[in-house]
From Swiss-Prot:
The protein, known as: Autoinducer 2 import system permease protein LsrD
Matches recorded under PANTHER family: ABC TRANSPORTER PERMEASE PROTEIN YPHD-RELATED-RELATED, AUTOINDUCER 2 IMPORT SYSTEM PERMEASE PROTEIN LSRD
Organism: Yersinia pseudotuberculosis serotype IB (strain PB1/+)
Membrane-spanning residues: 7-27, 45-65, 67-87, 90-110, 118-138, 162-182, 212-232, 240-260, 261-281, 288-308
Protein's job: Part of the ABC transporter complex LsrABCD involved in autoinducer 2 (AI-2) import. Probably responsible for the translocation of the substrate across the membrane.
Lineage: Bacteria, Pseudomonadati, Pseudomonadota, Gammaproteobacteria, Enterobacterales
Gene name per UniProt: lsrD
Main location per the UniProt record: membrane
Family: Belongs to the binding-protein-dependent transport system permease family. AraH/RbsC subfamily.
Length: 333
C-alpha cells in the first residue's frame, strides 16, 4: 500500500505502457516483437535524454523551450568543427561545452533580468535556431543533406548494441539513474523541490537559488548536446533541424510523467515511463498507417488532457467544496 501511495502514478504509467503495446499489437503483430520494441526506441529516445533534466527545470518552477534549437546548433557546430579538421575526440567535448554554454546563457538571462523563463527561452529558441541556420549556410550545408562524411566509427556508434540493447537506450537508462539519484537522493535535488514550491521562502532560507538554476539549465544544455551527438551519429549527417520536432513530445512526457507545470513536484521515473508511452504511441500509430498529422494532433490532445487532469487533481479539494455548496443550496431550496 505504501509503495502504491509513493509510486502510484508511475505504476499507472507502467500499466498504460503495457496496455498500449498490447492494443497496438492486436493491429500489427510486429509491435509485440521484442527486437522491434527495443530498436524502435532509437527513433525517439533522444527526446527522453533531454526530458530528464527538463523535468528538474520544470520542478524548480522554470521552463526551457529552447532545447530543440540547442540540439540543432550543437549538431551543426559538430559538423563544422569536424569539417575544419578537428578530430572527433576533441569535437565531441567542444560540442558538449557549446550545449552547456547555451544553458548558462538561458540561466544568466533569467537571473539577471527577472523575466519569465518562458519568455527568455522563447527568445533564445530563435537566437540558437537562427545561429544554427546561419552556421549551416556558411558551411554550405543545404536541404536535408546537412554535413556528412563523418568517420565510420562515429556513425556506427548509435547503431551498435551493448548487452543486446541499442546504445542510445543504454545511455538513456544511465541518464535516468543519474538524474533520479541527483533529484531524489541529494541536497541539490531537495533544493530544486523547495525552489519550485516557493522561491520566496527558498530565498529567505538562504538556499543557493542562482547556483541551482545555473546547474539545471546547464544540464539541459548538456543533455541537448548529447542528444545532438547521438542524432548526428544515428543519421550520419549534421543538420540544423535535428531537434525541431522535440518540443511538444518532451514537454508532454514531463507533464504526463507527473511534473507540476507550476513547479514543486515531479518524478524522473515518471518522465522516463512517459517518454516510452509517448514514443510507442507515435511508433504504433505509424505502424498501423496513421498519417503524421493525426499522430501530432493526438500528442497535442494528450498534452491538453494531462494538463487539465493535473489541474483538476491539484484543485480537487476546491472542486469538492464547490460541489458540497451546490448540494447544500439545492437541499435548502
Amino acid at each position: 500500500m505504501n509503495l502504491y501511495r509513493r509510486y502510484g502514478w508511475e505504476l499507472t504509467l507502467a500499466a498504460l505502457l503495457v496496455l498500449e503495446i498490447l492494443l497496438f499489437g492486436l493491429s500489427n503483430s510486429r509491435m509485440l516483437d521484442i527486437n522491434v520494441l527495443l530498436f524502435s526506441t532509437s527513433d525517439f529516445i533522444c527526446i527522453g535524454i533531454v526530458a530528464l533534466p527538463l523535468t528538474m527545470v520544470i520542478v524548480s518552477g522554470g521552463i526551457d523551450i529552447s532545447f530543440g534549437s540547442t540540439i540543432g546548433l550543437c549538431a551543426i557546430f559538430l559538423g563544422i568543427v569536424f569539417q575544419a579538421g578537428v578530430p572527433m575526440s576533441v569535437a565531441i567535448p567542444l560540442t558538449v561545452l557549446v550545449g552547456a554554454l547555451c544553458g548558462l546563457i538561458n540561466a544568466g538571462l533569467i537571473l539577471y533580468t527577472g523575466v519569465n523563463p518562458l519568455v527568455i527561452t522563447l527568445g533564445t529558441l530563435y537566437l540558437f535556431g537562427g545561429s544554427a541556420l546561419l552556421l549551416s549556410g556558411l558551411s554550405g550545408a543545404t536541404g536535408y543533406e546537412g554535413i556528412g562524411g563523418f568517420p565510420a566509427a562515429f556513425t556506427d556508434f548509435a547503431n551498435q548494441t551493448l548487452f543486446g540493447l541499442p546504445i542510445p537506450l543504454v545511455i538513456f537508462m544511465l541518464c535516468v539513474l543519474l538524474f533520479w539519484l541527483l533529484m531524489h537522493r541529494t541536497h541539490s535535488g531537495r533544493h530544486v523541490f523547495l525552489i519550485g514550491q516557493s522561491s520566496r521562502v527558498a530565498r529567505y532560507s538562504a538556499l543557493p537559488i542562482a547556483r541551482t538554476l545555473c546547474m539545471l539549465y546547464a544540464m539541459t544544455g548538456v543533455a541537448s548536446a548529447i542528444a545532438a551527438i547521438l542524432l548526428v551519429s544515428y543519421f550520419g549527417s549534421a543538420r540544423s533541424d535535428l531537434g525541431a520536432s522535440f518540443l511538444m513530445p518532451a514537454i508532454t512526457a514531463v507533464v504526463l510523467g507527473g511534473a507540476n507545470i507550476y513547479g514543486g513536484s515531479g518524478s524522473i521515473l515518471g518522465t522516463a515511463l512517459a517518454v516510452l508511452l509517448v514514443g510507442y504511441l507515435q511508433q504504433g500509430l505509424q505502424m498501423i498507417g496513421t498519417p503524421n498529422q493525426i499522430s501530432s494532433a493526438l500528442s497535442g490532445a494528450l498534452l491538453i488532457l494531462v494538463v487539465v487532469g493535473r489541474s483538476i487533481s491539484l484543485h480537487r479539494h476546491l472542486i469538492y467544496e464547490w460541489l458540497q455548496r451546490r448540494r447544500s443550496r439545492k437541499a435548502s431550496v
